[in-house]
Every structure is written in structure tokens, then in C-alpha cells.
From Swiss-Prot:
PROSITE patterns: SAM_MT_RNA_M5U, TRMA_1, TRMA_2
Encoding gene, per UniProt annotation: trmA
Gene3D superfamilies the record matches: 2.40.50.1070, Vaccinia Virus protein VP39
GO MF terms held by the record: rRNA binding; tRNA (uracil(54)-C5)-methyltransferase activity, S-adenosyl methionine-dependent; tRNA binding
Domain of life: Bacteria
Pfam (any one): tRNA_U5-meth_tr
Coiled-coil regions listed in the entry: none
Entry EC number(s): 2.1.1.-, 2.1.1.35
Protein name: tRNA/tmRNA (uracil-C(5))-methyltransferase
Annotated active site: 326, 360
Enzyme class: transferase
GO biological processes: tRNA methylation
Ligand binding (S-adenosyl-L-methionine): 190, 218, 223, 239, 301
Methyltransferase found in the keyword field: yes
Length: 368
């Protein structure tokens, strides 16, 4: 099977179709005109994963068709950044020439940045030894001498070898600010860097006249928290995943931001804490006094499942709500509750995933 054809000349057509679909989907609500934020038509995806196919002396990248499950060879991957595409053939050629590096390798993951750093994870169906580490170190040096700013990770069952760091440092331009973000391998990062910048700028614009404090649920590595910090007196943000919390703490320090506090707990537990249903030792240990915060704006960026009813009702207690959604279906369900108490004053489509049916939406609501 050959690689599916993706034609950048059709980019605007698919974006127009999404615009119409999202507008129609939310037509039952009183929404303002949809703001549409486009993606580059190609080389927009910051990360990519490929299986490795061994065929005699040859070795190459493959992907699998989602419907037929048939494999197809990938020598150039149009959605991926130029940085990934520039590295792919050089990496494959170098690995192909090393019995140690290619033996039982089955997958390669790339994580790139707009800042120029790239992280490559090489996955194996065997345990890795000192010989692998030595060859990988040589490979890393060779590629960096060719102009790449690259780190390598070797993974096998219950083991990981890191050369020399397991993260990249991304720099995003948000209006006149340059924000620094630590992005760790295997943790969530925004897949489309250019659109991520547009999302941050939109969020900053929506909240520029804010007063008081901001509460953010599901904050990840602090992606939005850091950009929004300048619009609020203080930001209190929650996140459950430990690697994301650690990255968020790093990012706060790297950007010299002193008004953001991250709490590691689930949105559901935080809802209970806010409503005084139970006390959480974690809050006491981190010296977080919820009563000292004057949060009249809340920011939510939930997983695809959306917010549960209890969290929706807690969110309704805030004057202003910003909701970023990767699943318009659950956003619509949540809006059925939120729109009873709040008006929708901003409505946006972010084309994070061109040429797919996936749509990222942003809604800003203010109390009626």
C-alpha cells in the first residue's frame, strides 16, 4: 500500500467544511460569529511516531492505514515539521548501518519544537546494553555535528536509557512575549506549535480586562497558566499527572513568573475541596489557602470526555468561564448546563489537526 495523499492545495476547503460543521453544531446556542484560526497547510505537526520495518538488509519507516490496517512506507511525512523530515532519512541510514542499533528496533518517536530542539525515542523488543549505549552516543554526536540539536532515548521493557535529557525546551511567541516550556517525552504537549501560539494569544485577548484571580483545571505543563498570568493577580492551577506538574514548576521558574501556583490533584477532588466537602492534606502541605483566592474567572481544558456534571456545576459558580475543548460533542453537552447561567461571548475554532475530522474549539462565557 502507498502512503495516503494529502494535498495542501485543499487545505482551505477542509477548513471551510470544519467551520460550517462547528457553526451548525452549536447553532442551538446563542453564539457570536465563529473566529477561525488556521494551521500551516503542511509541516505543522510537532511530533510523529513510526513503526520500523525490517526487510533483509533494508530498514524503513512505516505507518498503518486506520481502516484497512495495511502498512505503507513513509520516507517523507508531510504533516510533520521540517525538522522531523530533515532528520528522518539521516537517522534511518545511520541505524541501518549499525547491527547494534537496528537489532529488534520496532518503533521511533520524534518530538520536535519551534525552538529547534528535537528528541528521538527508539523502542526495542530486547534489553539494551552498554554496547547499545556506546553506539547511540556516537549516533547522537554524528547527528549533532550535522546541525541538529538532538537528544536520544532508548526504550525497552521496563528500561529507559537517556542521552542526555528526556525533554525539549520549546519557546512560544505570544504577542510580544517569548514563553519557555519544558516538554517531557511521553507526556502531553500541544501537537501543532503554530496553532498553539494562536490559542494562547486568543486566551490572553479574551481575558485582558480581567480582575482578581484565575483558577485553571487540567493545566498540564502550565501551557495556558503562564501566558494568562499577566492578566490576573494570581493563578491557581490543578493537574493530576506528576510529570506535567513537574514540568509546570520548571516552566514557572524558567519564565520568572511569581503569581502562579500548581496543585497536584484531580478536578473532581478539587471541586470537593472548593465546596468544603472534605479537607485535603495535599493543599495544607503546599500551603494553599483556597479562601485567600478571589477567583472570578475559571479556565478549563478537559480531556475528550469533557467535565462531569459536578464539575460543570462548580464551574457555573464563576463570573467568567474559558473552555478549551478537543471534543465538540462533550463541549456541547457541557454547554447545555453552562449556558443556563452564562452567555457565550467568544467562540473559536483552532485547526490543530488539518485533514482530519478533529476540531479544537474555544468558548468564553460571562454570567448573565
Amino acid at each position: 500500500m502507498t502512503q495516503p495523499v494529502m494535498n495542501p492545495e485543499n487545505y482551505q476547503v477542509q477548513l471551510d467544511e470544519k467551520t460550517e460543521a462547528l457553526s451548525a453544531m452549536f447553532s442551538e446556542f446563542d453564539v457570536p460569529e465563529l473566529e477561525v484560526f488556521s494551521s500551516p497547510a503542511e509541516n505543522y505537526r510537532m511530533r510523529a511516531e513510526f513503526r520500523i520495518w525490517h526487510e533483509g538488509d533494508d530498514m524503513y519507516y512505516v505507518m498503518f492505514d486506520q481502516k484497512t490496517k495495511e502498512k505503507y512506507r513513509v520516507d517523507y511525512f508531510l504533516p510533520a515539521t521540517r525538522l522531523i523530515n530533515d532528520l528522518m532519512p539521516l537517522l534511518a541510514e545511520a541505524i541501518k548501518g549499525s547491527k547494534t542499533l537496528r537489532y529488534k528496533m520496532f518503533q521511533v518517536d520524534f518530538l520536535s519544537t519551534l525552538s529547534g530542539e528535537i528528541l528521538v525515542s527508539m523502542l526495542y523488543h530486547r534489553q539494551l546494553d552498554d554496547a547499545w549505549k556506546e553506539e547511540a552516543a556516537v549516533l547522537k554526536q554524528q547527528l549533532n555535528e550535522k546541525g541538529f540539536n538532538l537528544n536520544l532515548i532508548g526504550r525497552a521493557r521496563k528500561m529507559k536509557i537517556v542521552l542526555d535529557q528526556e525533554f525539549v525546551i520549546e519557546k512560544l511567541k505570544v504577542n510580544d512575549d517569548i514563553l519557555t516550556y519544558k516538554q517531557v517525552e511521553n507526556s502531553f504537549t500541544q501537537p501543532n506549535g503554530v496553532v498553539a501560539q494562536k490559542m494562547l494569544e486568543w486566551a490572553v485577548d479574551c481575558t485582558q480586562d480581567s480582575q482578581g484571580d484565575l483558577l485553571e483545571l487540567y493545566c498540564g505543563n502550565g501551557n495556558f497558566s503562564l501566558a494568562l498570568a499577566k492578566n490576573f493577580d494570581r493563578v491557581l492551577a490543578t493537574e493530576l499527572a506528576k510529570p506535567s506538574v513537574e514540568s509546570a514548576q520548571y516552566n514557572i521558574a524558567a519564565n520568572n513568573i511569581d503569581n502562579v501556583q500548581i496543585v497536584r490533584m484531580s478536578a473532581e477532588d478539587f471541586t470537593d475541596a472548593m465546596e468544603g466537602k472534605r479537607e485535603f492534606r495535599r493543599l495544607k502541605d503546599q500551603n494553599v489557602d483556597l479562601k485567600s483566592y478571589n477567583c472570578n474567572t475559571i479556565f478549563v481544558d478537559p480531556p475528550r470526555s469533557g467535565m462531569d456534571e459536578g464539575t460543570c456545576k462548580m464551574v457555573q459558580g464563576y463570573e467568567r468561564i474559558m473552555y478549551i475543548s478537543c471534543n465538540p460533542d462533550t463541549l456541547k453537552e457541557n454547554l447545555a448546563i453552562l449556558s443556563k447561567t452564562h452567555n457565550i461571548t467568544r467562540f473559536a475554532l483552532f485547526d490543530q489537526f488539518p485533514y482530519t475530522h478533529h476540531m479544537e474549539a474555544g468558548i468564553f462565557l460571562e454570567r448573565k
